[in-house]
């Protein structure tokens, strides 16, 4: 039923907890997981000035850090017999998640209910809320 899972992560507690649900779906026929981390470029110009580093250098650092944080999750999911693909993308989180879901032809998205920035969620609306409103496939939103 849910053979291909998209797991967008920002490494928040809720996102990490989602891994348990992904492993449960292995027993229900899941075969593939796409782990996605989206680097949100908003505000990076200010960060580059503050860090006295060029924009491209910051993006490279962020991608390397994301891949390092994903690696243990990738190994854990492979350890239960799932095929895992890792994608680190740049863009608006909601739009990029929807784009990757379409490109990868996933059957379900499993996402955390809140990201790392609760203030951002209160001001702008959470990514999970936007996904629920816009997605055309099943989505499981995992609470802490």
In which residue ranges do the predicted regions lie?
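Small/aliphatic-rich secondary-structure junction motif
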Residues: 1-53
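Conserved beta-strand positions in the Rossmann-like core of class I SAM-dependent methyltransferases
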Residues: 34, 85, 140
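Structural beta-alpha unit
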Residues: 49, 75-109
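Short, hinge-like loop/turn segments at secondary-structure boundaries
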Residues: 50-54, 103-104, 127-128
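A short acidic, glycine-rich active-site loop
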Residues: 54-67
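Glycine-rich, Arg-bearing micro-motifs that act as flexible, cationic patches
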Residues: 111-133
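Short, flexible loop segments at boundaries between secondary-structure elements
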Residues: 137-144
């Amino acid at each position: 039923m849910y053979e291909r899972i998209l797991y967008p992560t920002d490494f928040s507690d809720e996102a990490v907890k989602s891994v348990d649900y992904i492993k449960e779906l292995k027993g229900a026929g899941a075969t593939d997981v796409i782990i996605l981390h989206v680097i949100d470029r908003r505000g990076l110009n200010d960060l580059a000035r503050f860090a006295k580093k060029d924009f491209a250098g910051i993006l490279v650092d962020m991608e390397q850090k994301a891949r390092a944080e994903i690696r243990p999750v990738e190994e854990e999911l492979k350890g239960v017999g799932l095929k895992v693909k890792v994608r680190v993308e740049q863009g608006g989180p909601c739009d990029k998640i929807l784009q990757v879901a379409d490109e990868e032809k996933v059957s379900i998205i499993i996402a955390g209910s809140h990201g790392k920035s609760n203030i951002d969620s209160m001001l702008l609306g959470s990514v999970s809320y936007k996904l629920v409103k816009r997605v055309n496939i099943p989505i499981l939103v995992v609470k802490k």
